[in-house]
Amino acid sequence: MFMGEFEHSVDTKGRLIIPAKFREQLGEQFVVTRGMDGCLFGYPMTEWTALQEKLKALPVNRKDARAFVRFFYSAATECELDKQGRINLPKSLRDHAALTKQCVIVGVANRFEIWSAERWNDFSTKAEEDFDDIAENLIDFGM
């Protein structure tokens, strides 16, 4: 399970250190792709495979399903860690998440997310303000 919040920076070549706690769970290869809310999603191969099965089951006759799958897969990249525990993020992914220097990597149960520090600060400030309301709304989902 991925949890915690870690600050790192992207270098000029697009390399980003993955936290040691996450590296242990990721294995040799994993996938990073565009995420929602302006961040990137990272999945261990087992989670990525399970997600692929769900995405393949979406109806191709639905325009929104086609658009989502196309957008999600088109930027997906298999990553391998170098000897320093870094991955190389393609420019398209860095652009999607506005990653220029300071990043925040957060654990979100079965995946991790990569945020620009600025976007993460904005998101977490808003989430903290709305936390009670969000929690109350989740009661509808059995929480």
From Swiss-Prot:
Entry-linked PROSITE patterns: SPOVT_ABRB
Subcellular location: Cytoplasm, Nucleoid
Ranges of residues in domain SpoVT-AbrB: 5-47, 76-119
Tagged with keyword Cell wall biogenesis/degradation: no
InterPro entries: MraZ (IPR003444), MraZ_C (IPR035644), MraZ_dom (IPR020603), MraZ_N (IPR035642), MraZ_sf (IPR038619), SpoVT-AbrB_dom (IPR007159), SpoVT-AbrB_sf (IPR037914)
PANTHER family on file: TRANSCRIPTIONAL REGULATOR MRAZ
Subunit organization: Forms oligomers.
Protein name: Transcriptional regulator MraZ
Source organism of this protein record: Levilactobacillus brevis (strain ATCC 367 / BCRC 12310 / CIP 105137 / JCM 1170 / LMG 11437 / NCIMB 947 / NCTC 947)
